[in-house]
Amino acid sequence: MPTPTRPARASDLDRLVAIEELAFQTDRISRRSFRAFMERKTAMLHVIEQEGEVAGYFLVLFRRNSALARLYSIAVHPGCSGHGLGTQLLQAAEQAAFEGGRFVLRLEVREDNPGAIALYRKHGYREWGRYLDYYEDHTDALRFEKVLRGDAEVESNVPYFPQSQEFTCGPACLMMALAHFQPNYRWDAVEEIRIWRESTTIFMLSGPGGCGPLGLALAAQRRGLHVKVLLSHEGPLFLDSVRSPAKREVMELAQTDFRQRIETSDIPVEYRSLDLNDLRETLARGGLALVLISAFQMLGVKVPHWVLVIGDTGTHFVIHDPFVDYEVSETPADCSSLPISHSLFLGMAQFGKQGLRACLLVHEEPLP
């Protein structure tokens, strides 16, 4: 039976320092730093005991307003090895990060530490980068990460479809919803670009534009879905980063066209912010939600990004993120059925200086 961990306390300092000195040759955590981590609100330092004595620890760091947590350090006293304590500590660290609202745990490990690397790979971590000359002795660090899903397996019958272009997250989300509600729906890259052409804002930064909520709503209705739009701002969207007057004018004209077509349709638009109940009630009635987020907390870049909300565990929303970063060996399994805590997701679901919130609530049947 797994041994539970507990928060470290001041009386553990001698043992923690001893473990550190025995487990690592360089880059050791000092007594002073251990004490500081115990008091830091954005850190979780837990120990595991064997026969009444501290046998190991993990240290997880949380970054505010981020979906990521970092396993800063993990160690087992050499005299206590061989009892599976490393695995228990790793699993406890993952659970702590997940319960802290994070759904990705990252770590660094020395490239010359095959035992630790094997442990991480065994438990589903994937290598996604390298830090050169990272440690005090100039050894490189390998970077690993794992998507956290908590204790319960999240099952979904909503198909997953990765976007094929950088600017087609919105169409990919809509196609997933269409494939869920319409089993005979044919989805492919041609349809993806067709939806993008119908709903694009024309420009975004220096490249092709992403898709706006009104254009996507019209595309959804055209394909037989019933949709309701929640939008926190009236008027043109996504203009904060557009410096060219010519581009701004074209974007404003395109969005004026969307608004005029929405006004002559029967698509309801409510100009207010999305809230928790909007999503939970939609999901409870069998609907899905396309939600605009800032990609910064997930992808590290400040761009608008559409995701599809497909489920609710009671504490977490479950999403399909259409972006798969193949350059770092991601697969669709890494990006589908992601559980994100309610509070973290609502924090992510806004973009830009004005805090734009946009959401499409989509259903197979007419809305009540």
Positions of PLM-derived features:
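Active-site-adjacent substructure of cysteine-protease-like catalytic cores
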Residues: 239, 244, 248-321
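Active-site-adjacent structural segments surrounding the nucleophilic cysteine of cysteine proteases
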Residues: 148-248, 256, 272-273, 315, ...
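Noncatalytic regulatory segments and standalone regulatory/sensor domains
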Residues: 284, 288, 294-296, 300-306, ...
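Short glycine/serine/proline-enriched coil/turn segments at secondary-structure junctions
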Residues: 65-66, 134-136, 298-301
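Conserved catalytic-core motifs of GNAT/GCN5-like acyltransferases
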Residues: 108-109, 121, 126-143
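Conserved glycine-rich acetyl-CoA-binding loop
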Residues: 53, 73-91, 98-100, 104, ...
